[in-house]
Amino acid sequence: SYIELLEIARDGKRSRDFELITMELFKNIYKINAIVLGGARKPDGVLYMPEFGVIVDTKAYADGYSKSIAQADEMIRYIEDNKRRDPSRNSTKWWEHFPTSIPANNFYFLWVSSVFVNKFHEQLSYTAQETQTVGAALSVEQLLLGADSVLKGNLTTKKFIDSFKNQEIVFAPSILHS
């Protein structure tokens, strides 16, 4: 069950499971096309509909995800790869998973992790500023609360994308004790 994401997100040894199950949840519950990529010089996955695309990076950390310029730079590279779409810059051509129908200004970035700590918000602003691209961070708890909202008919795909505001997404008040 998807609830196990709460534990997997805190287990660095299960990073791949975290990627796979997170993307499966987006596909099966949020009803957004999701492709798992991962590997060298590729984001962990992409989400897309005909009108938008999201570059996804998942991080499984026991103590939460804190600001890392190296990881911001990695996301910036993915965003730039997708903008330029130049195989001589990145021969993996991972961006070809996005449909050609997506307008150039309708791409987003997303980090998913157990929790976001310390100055993580600075990583979001820095990445957005460097790429002129809107992004977000989504904790596993909010990912699950969002899924519950989707199932109840309260969270549409449009509302999901509209919640990308270069900050952490909060669909509902936390029900976990930190």
Say what each PLM segment does:
Residues S1-H177:
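Catalytic core segments in nucleotide and nucleic-acid processing enzymes
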